[in-house]
Regions:
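C-terminal hydrophobic helical "lid"/dimerization subdomain
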Residues: 1-9, 253-257, 297-356
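Residue-level marker of beta-strand positions
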Residues: 13, 69, 88-89, 103, ...
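Glycine-rich beta-strand-centered segment in the early N-terminal region that forms part
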Residues: 29-43, 56-102, 142-144
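NAD(P)H dinucleotide-binding glycine-rich loop of Rossmann-like/cofactor-binding domains
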Residues: 98-177, 315
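Mid-domain Rossmann-like dinucleotide-binding core that forms the NAD(H)/NADP(H) cofactor-binding site
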Residues: 145-224
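Glycine-rich cofactor phosphate-binding loops and adjacent beta1-alpha1 units
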Residues: 166, 210-288, 328, 351-353
Length: 356
């Protein structure tokens, strides 16, 4: 089937249930007014996917259809979509705003009061042969990016947004807590802004070594009793900005402890439960705690630029590509420390010359 043909009948779709992950049959959805039908090519397994599969995600209930990091091809367009045509290679913003609430009208669709999310509790997800989505959430992938690079646009947009909320890090000292895919993507994005120094914390030695290879000035064992002191020593001072990509109680305390007076702690990770804050330190040191939720279109545009310019290279992050039939194995790989970014091959490459 070519991208220009209209599919019909049934398709494959991944469903994550308690203690199992299956590929099941489902009807091919039809695009409504203002929507496009996308044929999935590659879908990334996110940390939120593995946490949800383990029953640890606060906002995703089982069973659910996963997949929000995706590169695909427009297969069909609904009425009222003049700007896209079948055959275009695309990625999507998976957040699904109402467009009418106070936050949406302010241009903050990422924190819409009625937000849905493709692949995170929505009836559809990108780990399927096809899915429909609002055409306003679709971004055309430039020809310079191969499919693997395009699959990183969505996850890279999360740290790009966090950097924006921190008012950038040029000339500032930075601590990044966590060296998973988001923490390491954040490292590369931060380095592009010219920080004074960047230190990464991670419990596993191989992740600390990887952070150093990707440009960190130092890497500290997150489990060390004196981790906060080590970060300060490596920075030469307390951190102007701390990005917590783990969001556990331990990292929250570390982040506040290593932040400079008047500094900023950006919460990038998704906490799995309630966390107690050392609020007396926050007040006394005038520390700003800044939440960071997904991203906006300008962050997607910046992510595309970071990838096209080579600041972020897919070869540094994509460690496995698994066929759709091996989705359970892909989730196991993504949850293991041996892998950074695991992709699921839903279909053949969008363009064989750009398969990556």
């Amino acid at each position: 089937m070519t991208a220009q043909q209209t599919p019909s009948g049934t398709m494959r779709q991944v469903v994550v249930s308690a203690e199992r992950i299956d590929v099941v049959g489902a009807d091919v959805p039809r695009p409504g007014v203002g929507e496009v039908l996308v044929r999935s090519v590659l879908a990334g397994v996110c940390g939120s996917d593995t946490h949800a599969a383990a029953g640890l995600h606060p906002w995703i209930s089982l069973p659910y259809v996963p997949g929000h990091e995706v590169v695909g091809v427009v297969s069909e367009v609904g009425a009222g979509v003049p700007s896209l045509e079948p055959g275009r290679r695309v990625t999507v913003e998976p957040s699904l705003p109402c467009w009418n609430c106070k936050q949406c009208l302010r241009g903050q669709q990422n924190i819409c009061e009625n937000l849905g999310f493709l692949g995170c509790g929505d009836p559809q997800g990108a780990m399927a042969d096809y899915f429909t989505v609002d055409a306003r959430r679709v971004h055309v992938v430039p020809d310079e990016l191969d499919d693997r690079a395009a699959a990183l646009i969505e996850p890279l947009s999360t740290p790009v947004h966090a950097l924006r909320l921190a008012d950038g890090v040029s000339g500032r000292t930075v601590a990044i807590l966590g060296a998973g895919s988001i923490g390491l993507l954040l490292l590369r994005a931060a380095l592009s802004q010219g920080p004074k120094r960047v230190v990464v914390t991670a419990p596993r030695a191989e992740r600390r070594e990887l952070a150093l290879a990707l440009g960190a000035d130092a890497a500290v064992d997150a489990y060390a009793d004196d981790a906060v002191e080590q970060v300060r020593a490596a920075l030469g001072e307390s951190a102007d900005v701390v990005f917590d990509c783990v969001a556990s109680e331990a990292t929250t305390r570390q982040a506040i402890g290593m932040a400079d007076k008047g500094g900023t702690v950006v919460v990038v990770g998704v906490p799995s439960g309630e966390i107690q804050l050392p609020l007396q330190l926050v007040q006394d040191r005038q520390i700003r705690i800044q939440g960071s939720a997904t991203y906006l279109p300008e962050d997607v545009a910046d992510s595309i630029e970071l990838l096209t310019s080579g600041v972020v290279r897919p070869g540094d992050f994509v460690t496995s590509v698994v066929p759709m039939e091996g989705v359970a194995e892909a989730f196991e790989q993504a949850a293991s420390p041996q892998h950074i970014k695991v992709l699921i091959a839903i279909d053949g490459p969008a363009d064989p010359d750009r398969a990556g």
